[in-house]
Amino acid sequence: MARNKLDGVIEAVRYAPGGKIDFVRFYERHGVVWSDAILLERKDLAEQLKLGKRVVVGKRRANIGSVFETGPAVLQKEANIMTEGQSGNGDNLDGIPVF
């Protein structure tokens, strides 16, 4: 069975006072390697999703730099960014820590 390639993993999120995502802690795939953690603003995350990049929530496994424990996909529904299976208004990345 072929593994689906991921383009990015969101490890943590910070919400602005209005409930929208302010920025996320993000790992980006570069070929067979992954970036260090970067802080990605909401507009840049929305652009990644608009380009069709496959982004999921997850966390990097300790001492194994290129292995992640992954969760649901992150989708953009209209103006909202949410994890797969979520509904409602506003941004909602369920199951990842807030920092």
Question: For each of these PLM feature ranges, what is it?
Answer:
Residues 7, 21, 51-54, 77-79:
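Short, surface-exposed beta-edge/turn micro-motifs
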Residues 28-73:
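Acidic, aromatic-enriched beta-alpha/helix-loop junctions
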Residues 2, 18, 47-49, 73, ...:
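A generic structural signal for short, solvent-exposed coil/turn residues
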Residues 61-99:
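Short, compact, well-ordered microdomains
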Residues 15, 50-54, 86, 98:
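Generic surface-pattern signal
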Residues 2-33:
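Short, surface-exposed binding/anchoring microloops in extracellular/periplasmic proteins
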